[in-house]
Amino acid sequence: MNTLNRRVSPIPYSLHAQGRVMNGAFRIDLRNDGRTAAEFQIQSKPDMDALRSYTVEAGNSLCGWWEGAAGTGEYDLTVHGPNGFFRNFRGVLSGADGRVVEVRTTYDVHPHGVRLELSNPTGQELIVSIFDRYNSRTTAFVVDPGESESRRWAVERTGGWYDLTVTVNGNRTFAMQLAGHVENGEDSVSNRLMEAFA
């Protein structure tokens, strides 16, 4: 099925949301590198906080903190922003033997792409997998203790859209889904997948 739809004009957004366990809680850093203010909405599952809204001015950043669910330490947080910007962070604050990876996202305008920098804050080797929803392909690689690995995905063929899910071998509770659109100042296409995120 062709998920690409009508042509759309460029918009002034360049958004980021980075999540990680820190000081016994889960922290999300929101950053707006665009030219206009952007509103983020963050929804948590039951036993945590309800919906929160954040307005981040152009060139600014904000952060929020969440405790894990009572009794389990589980977290499941979903971030929505303009133009299909989407992040989902799932896991347990204590992790599974500490097997977690930290992810930072950057965008390439020319050539059009999205890049993930994956850092291993633990003392053990991690096997990280990234599932690309657009081509149903999984990439797996090793991140050594205290080291980082960078992987890039071209998005020309998807009209600038991406949808990637990061998991760590041996930790079934941990996952990050990162999806949205990379703006490059040119006309693009809308995308029906943005209405069907898991």
Regions found by a protein language model. Give the residues of each.
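Long, His/Glu/Asp-enriched segments that create or flank divalent metal/ion-associated functional microenvironments
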Residues: 1-23
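A structural motif detector for short, solvent-exposed N-terminal "entry" segments of globular domains
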Residues: 16-20, 106-113
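Asparagine-centered strand-capping/turn motif at beta-strand->loop junctions
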Residues: 22-38, 42-44, 112-126, 130-132
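Glycine-centered tight beta-turn/hairpin loop motif at sheet-sheet or coil-to-beta transitions
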Residues: 35, 47-49, 82-84, 134-136, ...
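Predominantly soluble domains enriched in secretory-pathway, periplasmic, or organellar proteins
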Residues: 37-40, 44-47, 54, 81, ...
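Intrinsically disordered, low-complexity Pro/Gly/Ser/Thr-rich segments with frequent PxxP/GP/PP motifs
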Residues: 44-72, 132-163
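Terminal connector regions
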Residues: 67-111, 155-198
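Copper-binding active sites and cupredoxin-like electron-transfer domains
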Residues: 75, 122, 126-129, 142-147, ...
